[in-house]
């Protein structure tokens, strides 16, 4: 059972900076609360209170909430409307889908002068014949019942038929209460339901541990529980809640169990080594001229080197990166005792230098030594002077001076010509004005 505590209210008062004494709106829905308590002492200024979808069997401890305007108690186990006379400012009361069968208890709401809206849909009393006329006539200040507005003509008619409707309602109420007593006696025959009901009211409800069952058996029991017909009573709702709570606790218990990881197969039973890359790192493997295999493993740049574990074997390499295994089969046998590992300070890559066990004799490459600058210049001069100079063959008869290129007598024809300026004729009607300055 969940009790209303100060910590619970403070967590629900985040919109009010965690202050509960000045709280005007409080939402405690779907908390499995089974009793209303402490709210009337800690939150005197409450105007809106949401308590829907809980397990509250009785309306209590709300009489001191003088400023309360809206109270939502839908989807609970309330059977009687009571203890609301002190809520002087109450304007809206929601009791949807409860177990209110004593409709005569609605007469206590006539003391709430500001009550305008009332919701009783989904209760056993809503099925009584003359239910609406009785409520409209008994609570004269109501303006809306079950979301439907009350007209003046409906109210007058209900007041005129109040005596007959009251007699009819009381008869149906008595019949329902007798059936309710039978339901309680039947519930007493089942000790599990009776125990869960008494424990829920006392706040000492305990949930048994789920036994180990197969998946098929659990599904069959779950289907049988929900498909089994049962009366709609507070006991059946508590039984459904207990079943859901057991299932939730069983799921939490399964989640809390440590999950054992299946070990990764690195070497098969026949001795074959497998390639494994659990950390999903990029790598490159190549051979240099010094008869060494170079393995460049792209380890994360900012990871500490203490989280790396390198194991070099003659035919494979195993690197453990933060508990994840990187294993690579080598193309040739190497010397583990002569191998070395280096870590780049810029990229963070891990370089493994693995000398080959069977070294191949390879020709050494010639190294070209750099020569001095003066020798290069002398060599260039020598190379230029050494080859023979090649010239074009020209007919000596065609040789002449540059002056003979253009024949004489044609010079004037090729000179640039100048265009002469033509003067425009002066008009006969032109009169010279001496005041106008000459054009420059």
UniProtKB/Swiss-Prot annotation:
Residues 178-192, 236-259, 379-392, 420-431 have a biased composition (Basic and acidic residues). One of its GO terms (cellular component) is cytoplasm. Residues 193-211, 369-378 have a biased composition (Polar residues). One of its GO terms (biological process) is protein localization to cilium. Residues 178-267, 363-440 are annotated as: Disordered. SUPFAM superfamilies: L domain-like. Coiled coil: none annotated. Residues 276-374 form the CS domain. PANTHER family: CILIA- AND FLAGELLA-ASSOCIATED PROTEIN 410-RELATED, LEUCINE RICH REPEAT PROTEIN. Interacts with dvl2. Interacts with kur. Plays a crucial role in regulating cilia motility in pronephric tubules, cloaca and neural tube. Required for establishing left-right asymmetry of the body plan; controls cell fate and convergent extension (CE) movements during gastrulation, respectively, via the Wnt and the planar cell polarity (PCP) signaling pathways. Required for the proper development of renal glomeruli and tubules. This is Dynein axonemal assembly factor 11. It comes from Danio rerio (Zebrafish). The gene is dnaaf11.
């Amino acid at each position: 059972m969940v009790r209303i505590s100060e910590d619970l209210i403070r967590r629900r008062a985040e919109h009010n900076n965690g202050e509960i004494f000045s709280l005007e709106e409080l939402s405690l829905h779907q908390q499995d609360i089974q009793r209303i308590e402490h709210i009337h002492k800690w939150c005197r200024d409450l105007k809106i209170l949401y308590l829907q979808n809980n397990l509250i069997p009785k309306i209590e401890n709300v009489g001191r909430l003088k400023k309360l305007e809206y109270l939502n108690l839908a989807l609970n186990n309330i059977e009687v409307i009571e203890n609301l006379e002190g809520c002087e400012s109450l304007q809206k009361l929601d009791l949807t889908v409860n177990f209110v069968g004593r409709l005569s208890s609605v007469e206590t709401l006539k003391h709430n002068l500001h009550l305008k809206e009332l919701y009783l849909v989904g209760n056993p009393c809503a099925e009584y014949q003359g239910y609406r006329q009785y409520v409209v006539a008994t609570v004269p200040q109501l303006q809306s019942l079950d979301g439907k507005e009350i007209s003046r003509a409906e109210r007058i008619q209900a007041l005129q038929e109040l005596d007959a409707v009251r007699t009819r309602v009381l008869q149906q109420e008595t019949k329902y209460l007798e059936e309710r007593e039978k339901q309680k006696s039947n519930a007493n025959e089942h000790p599990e339901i009776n125990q869960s009901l008494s424990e829920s009211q006392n706040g000492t409800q305990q949930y048994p541990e789920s036994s180990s069952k197969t998946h098929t058996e659990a599904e069959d029991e779950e289907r049988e529980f929900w498909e089994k017909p049962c009366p709609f009573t507070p006991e059946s709702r508590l039984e459904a809640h207990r079943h859901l709570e057991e299932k939730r606790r069983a799921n939490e218990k399964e989640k809390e169990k440590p999950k054992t990881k299946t070990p990764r197969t690195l070497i098969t039973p026949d001795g074959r080594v497998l390639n494994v890359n659990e950390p999903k790192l990029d790598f490159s493997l190549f051979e240099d001229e010094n008869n060494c295999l170079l393995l460049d493993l792209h380890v994360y740049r900012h990871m500490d080197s203490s989280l790396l574990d390198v194991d070099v074997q003659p035919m494979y390499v195993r690197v453990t990166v933060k508990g994840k295994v990187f294993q690579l089969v080598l193309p040739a046998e190497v010397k583990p005792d002569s191998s070395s590992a280096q870590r780049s300070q810029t990229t963070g890559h891990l370089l493994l230098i693995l000398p080959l066990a069977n070294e191949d004799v390879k020709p050494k490459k010639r190294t070209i030594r750099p020569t001095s600058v003066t020798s290069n210049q002398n060599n260039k001069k020598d190379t230029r002077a050494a080859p023979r100079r090649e010239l074009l063959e020209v007919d000596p008869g065609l040789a002449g001076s540059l002056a003979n290129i253009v024949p004489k007598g044609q010079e004037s024809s090729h000179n640039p010509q100048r265009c002469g300026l033509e003067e425009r004729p002066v008009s006969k009607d032109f009169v010279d004005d001496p005041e106008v300055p000459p054009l420059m």
